[in-house]
From Swiss-Prot:
This is Uncharacterized mitochondrial protein AtMg00490. GO terms for cellular component: mitochondrion. A stretch of 270 kb of the mitochondrial genome is duplicated within the centromere of chromosome 2 resulting in the duplication of the gene. The expression of the duplicated gene is not demonstrated. Signal peptide: none annotated.
Length: 107
C-alpha cells in the first residue's frame, strides 16, 4: 500500500511543531483497517468462502475456521479451498482482462 502524506503536523505541542491537526492522504484508495473497510472485507471474504463451501458440500454448513495453504495435505476443507481459489482466479481474470492461461504461458 502506498501512502503519501500531503501535510502532517503534530498535535502534541512539542517544540518546532504546530498544534494544527494532522492530515494524511492515501494514494491508492482507503487502506484496510480504517473505518468500514476491514469489516466489509471480512464479511465479503467469508461470504465467498461460504459460497464455495455450498458448492462443495450442498445443504450443509461449513465449520472450518481456517483454510489450508495450497498443496499441504487433503482434508475436508481442501475441496472448499480449491473452489475458493477457482473463484479468486475468475475474479482476477475478469478484473485484469487477461486470461490466466495467458499469464501462465508467459511465466
Amino acid at each position: 500500500m502506498a501512502v503519501r502524506c500531503s501535510k502532517i503536523q503534530r498535535t502534541d505541542g512539542r517544540p518546532g511543531h504546530s498544534l494544527q491537526p494532522a492530515k494524511v492522504s492515501f494514494v491508492a484508495g482507503q487502506p484496510l483497517g480504517y473505518y468500514s473497510s476491514w469489516p466489509l472485507f471480512a464479511l465479503s471474504h467469508h461470504m465467498v468462502v461460504w459460497y464455495a463451501a455450498e458448492h462443495v458440500y450442498p445443504s450443509s454448513f461449513f465449520f472450518q475456521s481456517k483454510l489450508p495453504p495450497s498443496e499441504v495435505f487433503a482434508y475436508p476443507g481442501m475441496e472448499v479451498f480449491n473452489e475458493y481459489t477457482l473463484y479468486h482466479a475468475w475474479v482476477d481474470e475478469a478484473l485484469s482482462g487477461v486470461s490466466k492461461m495467458e499469464l501462465y504461458a508467459k511465466a
